Amino acid sequence: VRPVKYFNIKGTFNWGEYTSKKLEGGEGVGSGDYNPMNRYVVGAWYDNPRGLNLRAEYGHMKSRVNKTDVVKENGAYVLAGWHWGKFLPIVRWDMYEDHVNTGTANNYNRILIGCTYSVFKNMKLQVNYGHFMYGDDARKGLGYDSSEQLQIMGLFKF
């Protein structure tokens, strides 16, 4: 849905099934040939190619087998940026929660600062710095409460 210029509202819902696979060292997720999986995502974007860029999304995924959650995850982000000539600097907050595997790095809040530079139409360079913060269960499992990430990328369209 596009109620006004540059603004989009989107959503998706997936209902389906997946199969468990035998993995080296044990069984896969679930309990049989067909395990239910539901997923939805909703989001809103405002992207003026000569100015403000705002985005937000929320997603949820769940699979329950024999009254037990085998997948129960939430994710969200909010992004703000400004198109400034060939540059697009941004700041972003995102989070992910895994309610089944609570002691893993899948449970975080992150603040990201980045910038994309459009070299020309089909080539962009991007640099991002992310600071991850982990909840109590993840801290216990990981042995640390935060981590850093530096990402440098080239994006090419052919």
Language-model regions, residue ranges each:
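Long hydrophobic alpha-helical segments that form multi-pass transmembrane helix bundles
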Residues: 1-3
